[in-house]
Amino acid sequence: MKKALTALCFASMGALLFGLEKPAAPAPVGPAITKVDIRPSKIEFSRWNTPVELTSLEDAKKHFEGDALDQLKAKVDFGNQIVLVFAWRGSGQDKLDYVVMESFPEQIAFSYRPGRTRDLRPHVHVFALRSNVKWRAGGK
């Protein structure tokens, strides 16, 4: 009985020691958001807070062609990322900003600041987000 109890204690201690080893390093995680400086070939202008969400290369082919599509394929991994295309017309001074909130997975809130000039200009912004990131444009 004493030998069985001693063996059980050693087995428990061994499991405890092996369980406290350093964990394997996590896989490298890319940035939550990346600005992509590629202009879509086929732009559908809408409101600033209704971006087009591209989740696959097939979706991207509807908005990008030729060199723009090749550049997008080189910069974005559609297996791990999505693409947001914001396109609207407004004042030349309109600004689109974003804030990355510290949580896991991260949350990104896009905000719009209207310009003060009365000129009508096209605005196009393309962002690549990790697919596990939650995002919202405007609102709360």
Regions found by a protein language model. Give the residues of each.
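Exposed, flexible binding/inhibitory loops of compact, secreted disulfide-stabilized domains
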Residues: 20-140
